[in-house]
Amino acid sequence: MSKALPLRLGVNVDHVATLRNARGGKHPDPVRAALAAIEAGADGITAHLREDRRHIRDADMARLKAEISKPLNFEMAATPDMVQIALATKPHAVCLVPERREEVTTEGGLDVIGHHNTLAPFIARFNDAGIRTSLFIAADPAQIEMAAELHAPVIEIHTGAWCDAVEAGNAVKAEAEWQRIVAGAKLAQSVGLEVHGGHGLDYATAQTISALPQIAELNIGFHLMGEALFVGLTESIRRMRAAMARGRQALEATA
């Protein structure tokens, strides 16, 4: 069995910005939410500057970089304009994601095979700038192997299909998607990639995936912010950290 890596929680604050933008003005402030999340135990903050600026804005990203004390993970489409903004912002990491204007949220993993010629120079520029690049991809062996060939140090496995199947009670599909994640995490680690997970995770699925020894980080936003409406952000994050700890403890018990 692989030795379990330390497990980090990245909190995504996009949905705070969505709520702010629904009415306009400055409140609620995603930077304030990020600071509160760090106070509550987040190891880092994730924010997605979409091309249509539907939630996070350029000024938010600049403030996050300037004001938070933990690493900033800058989610972005792989476009020349976004690359320039990210290089100017100098976050700890960037996560390259697919992006379509008509989607409500990121619907699938990045096709790194089909776009390798575009991605390669971007990844090289980030590596040269000391910015870690993560590729948000499905747990597909060919995509994982291409990520390694592109010299991206990190992948984030898209957990959405698995989480959706779990929520829908589709046990057969959930098990199939879970086995893809398990195999993908093992393969990724074997080819030298750091493995993260994200999209659609809640307390239960976060606990389950935390038992995979290859997973080093989970990036979670929507569930945390939704639960925060009822229990507060601090308690929502505390419960998530507890769920992740239970998953790691289950792993240690079987080691």
Swiss-Prot record:
Q: Where is this site: Transition state stabilizer?
A: E156
Gene Ontology annotations for the cellular component aspect, listed alphabetically: cytosol
Q: What reaction gets catalysed by this protein?
A: 3-amino-2-oxopropyl phosphate + 1-deoxy-D-xylulose 5-phosphate = pyridoxine 5'-phosphate + phosphate + 2 H2O + H(+)
**What EC number(s) does the entry state?**
2.6.99.2
Task: Provide this UniProt record's keywords sorted from A to Z.
Answer: Cytoplasm, Pyridoxine biosynthesis, Transferase
The encoding gene:
pdxJ
Q: List the catalytic residues.
A: H48, E75, H199
Q: What is its main location?
A: cytoplasm
**Pfam families given in the database record:** PdxJ
Localisation per UniProt entry: Cytoplasm
Q: Which amino acids does the record list as binding 3-amino-2-oxopropyl phosphate?
A: N12, R23, G200, G221, F222
Q: Which HAMAP family match?
A: PdxJ (MF_00279)
Annotated residues that bind 1-deoxy-D-xylulose 5-phosphate are located at D14, H15, R50, H55, T105
| A GO biological-process term | pyridoxine biosynthetic process
Assembly notes: Homooctamer; tetramer of dimers.
* Top-level EC class as recorded in UniProt: transferase
A GO MF term: pyridoxine 5'-phosphate synthase activity
What job does the chain carry out? Catalyzes the complicated ring closure reaction between the two acyclic compounds 1-deoxy-D-xylulose-5-phosphate (DXP) and 3-amino-2-oxopropyl phosphate (1-amino-acetone-3-phosphate or AAP) to form pyridoxine 5'-phosphate (PNP) and inorganic phosphate.
Gene3D superfamilies xref list = Aldolase class I
Q: What is this protein called?
A: Pyridoxine 5'-phosphate synthase
Q: Which InterPro entries match?
A: Aldolase_TIM, PyrdxlP_synth_PdxJ, Pyridoxine-5'_phos_synth
Q: Which family does it belong to?
A: Belongs to the PNP synthase family.
Question: Which pathway does it take part in?
Answer: Cofactor biosynthesis; pyridoxine 5'-phosphate biosynthesis; pyridoxine 5'-phosphate from D-erythrose 4-phosphate: step 5/5
